[in-house]
């Protein structure tokens, strides 16, 4: 552990201040004065020179601090992460107005130093401009062709479910950690779509990639990486950054090997997945003399990494939250299983059954809402000078759509801080869509895998609840199950074990 990371683990503001002031000397030597801004800017706490508001922010849980600040400063306010000015959008109405109604103004991605380090301006998630537009369009088209269309993805998920059930059955009702088995199953869906085939859960290449993705999610959300994003010159002293870069390099080499194998067996007339389709497009453009297109190796490699990472972490994490919540609230699990038994019986659940399982569907949506796995979304930036709700926001300003404040907006949800499936049910027990349900963000940067994720959550969740009863380990009560999230770029459940007892 480096000196900086050790100090960040302490709760002493004085210690943190002293450390930062000590390390600010190189920054002071290289920084110039900022220009005067125009117009009335969103309000916010007064920043300190260079430090900004970092002494007021909990870098381990910045989303909590930002929610508290919104109570004082309103639905649009300014905070300073070091010298970087950030506009925070809070509450459903404000976030929707920015991301949906003014999508062109707020639709660019803010590329932090850490994001740039592991994407280098390529791929789908952390890019802007024409390259992003083309890669996102191509990804949407091909993911639809190779899995996100109803039948293709449903078949892949139904193929994977027995493998996951088999792993859980091997525990014979004894306590186990859900992380590995759930993430392996979910990762195999995106792997089948991207590469054209699934992996065995014992394949060391596959398990290594999944483990590195999970670790990267934790590292990118760590306090030390937040410090690095504010003060990039701290990089040489941050061990988490070294680990992050090594993981990214290792993942890149593994993807290169997988792509090499697919190239050797490529049939342009029978594409197996996203990679094949990309390679065929690249080859076609090169044969026509277009050597400067966006279809180059870096965009391929980083797009694969983006799809694999996002397709593994968010859905797998949400599914784990769902199982934990069922164990914590057995009366809700009872109602889910009663509905599944009454409507489905012992046959395999299909996507078309969703309309006949309103309570189960409501529980899945409420899990996504309460789990709140992406509380600050992925940062945006303004594409031009904009006046928003009477405030001036300069072009290139970092913007945080505080999704936590949307999913827990007390103007939109009857009991925002409790697990209440009734949020998504009408008086007759039918499923009700809620406009403030923004678990996948919104606008130009809405999750491109939303359709696939919704299908995975429904089919995996119903199949597992049909087959198993989830409960705390012996000696642990429902009240003992901790819903405090593990800190990271996305919010995972804290380490825990569950028992999966067969119902058949």
Curated annotation (Swiss-Prot):
GO cellular component, one term: endoplasmic reticulum membrane
Listed InterPro entries: Cyt_P450 (IPR001128), Cyt_P450_CS (IPR017972), Cyt_P450_E_grp-I (IPR002401), Cyt_P450_sf (IPR036396), Cytochrome_P450_fam2 (IPR050182)
Gene3D superfamilies recorded: Cytochrome P450
Residue ranges crossing the lipid bilayer per the database entry: none
Reaction equation(s) it catalyzes: an organic molecule + reduced [NADPH--hemoprotein reductase] + O2 = an alcohol + oxidized [NADPH--hemoprotein reductase] + H2O + H(+)
Protein name, as recorded: Cytochrome P450 2K4
Cofactor requirements of the protein: heme
Highest rank taxon of the organism: Eukaryota
Residues given in the record as heme binding sites: 447
Family matches, as SUPFAM superfamilies: Cytochrome P450
A GO molecular-function descriptor: oxidoreductase activity, acting on paired donors, with incorporation or reduction of molecular oxygen, reduced flavin or flavoprotein as one donor, and incorporation of one atom of oxygen
Organism name: Oncorhynchus mykiss (Rainbow trout)
GO biological process terms held by the UniProt record: organic acid metabolic process; xenobiotic metabolic process
Subcellular location: Endoplasmic reticulum membrane; Microsome membrane
Lineage: Eukaryota, Metazoa, Chordata, Craniata, Vertebrata
Keyword Heme included in the entry's annotation: yes
Keyword Membrane listed: yes
Enzyme Commission code: 1.14.14.1
Keywords: Endoplasmic reticulum, Heme, Iron, Membrane, Metal-binding, Microsome, Monooxygenase, Oxidoreductase
Membrane topology: Peripheral membrane protein
Stretches assigned to coiled coil: none
Record family assignment: Belongs to the cytochrome P450 family.
């Amino acid at each position: 552990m480096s000196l900086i990371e050790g100090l960040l683990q302490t709760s002493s503001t004085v210690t943190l201040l002293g450390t930062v002031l000590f390390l600010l000397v190189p920054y002071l030597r290289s920084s110039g004065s900022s220009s005067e801004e125009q117009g009335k800017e969103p309000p916010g706490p007064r920043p300190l020179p260079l430090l900004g508001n970092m002494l007021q922010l909990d870098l381990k849980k910045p989303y909590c601090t930002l929610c508290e600040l919104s109570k004082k400063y309103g639905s649009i306010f300014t905070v300073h992460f070091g010298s970087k000015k950030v506009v925070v959008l809070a509450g459903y109405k404000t976030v929707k107005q920015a991301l949906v109604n003014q999508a062109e103004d707020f639709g660019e991605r803010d590329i932090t130093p850490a994001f740039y380090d592991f994407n280098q301006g390529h791929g789908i998630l952390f890019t802007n401009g024409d390259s992003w537009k083309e890669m996102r369009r191509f990804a949407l088209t091909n993911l639809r062709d190779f899995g996100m269309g109803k039948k293709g993805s449903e078949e892949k998920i139904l193929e994977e479910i027995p493998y996951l059930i088999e792993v859980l059955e091997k525990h014979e009702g004894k306590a186990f950690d859900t992380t590995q088995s759930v993430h392996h199953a979910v990762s195999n869906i995106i792997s089948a779509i991207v590469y054209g085939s699934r992996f065995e859960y014992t394949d060391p290449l596959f398990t290594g990639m999944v483990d590195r993705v999970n670790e990267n999610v934790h590292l990118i959300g760590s306090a030390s990486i937040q410090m690095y994003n504010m003060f990039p010159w701290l990089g040489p002293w941050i061990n988490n950054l070294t680990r992050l870069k090594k993981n990214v390099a290792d993942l890149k080499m593994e993807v290169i090997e997988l792509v090499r194998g697919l190239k050797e067996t490529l049939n342009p007339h029978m594409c197996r997945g996203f990679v094949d389709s990309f390679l065929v497009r690249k080859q076609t453009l090169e044969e026509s003399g277009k050597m400067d297109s966006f279809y180059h190796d870096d965009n391929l490699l980083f797009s694969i990494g983006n799809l694999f990472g996002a397709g593994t972490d968010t859905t797998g994490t949400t599914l784990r939250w769902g199982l934990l919540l069922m164990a914590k609230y057995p009366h809700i699990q009872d109602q889910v299983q009663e509905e599944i038994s009454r409507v489905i019986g012992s046959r395999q659940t299909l996507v078309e059954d969703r309309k006949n399982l309103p309570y189960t569907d409501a529980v899945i949506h409420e899990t996504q809402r309460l789990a709140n796995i992406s509380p600050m979304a992925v940062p945006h930036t303004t594409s031009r000078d904009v006046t928003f709700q009477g405030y001036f926001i300069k072009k290139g300003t970092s913007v945080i759509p505080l999704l936590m404040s949307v999913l827990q907006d007390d103007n939109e949800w009857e009991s925002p801080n409790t697990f209440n499936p009734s949020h998504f049910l009408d008086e007759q027990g039918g499923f009700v869509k809620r406009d403030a349900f923004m678990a996948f963000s919104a606008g130009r940067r809405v999750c491109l895998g939303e359709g696939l994720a919704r299908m995975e959550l429904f089919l995996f969740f119903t199949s597992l609840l049909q087959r198993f009863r989830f409960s705390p380990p012996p000696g642990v009560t429902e009240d003992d199950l901790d819903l405090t999230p593990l800190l990271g770029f996305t919010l995972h459940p804290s380490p825990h074990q569950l028992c999966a007892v067969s119902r058949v």
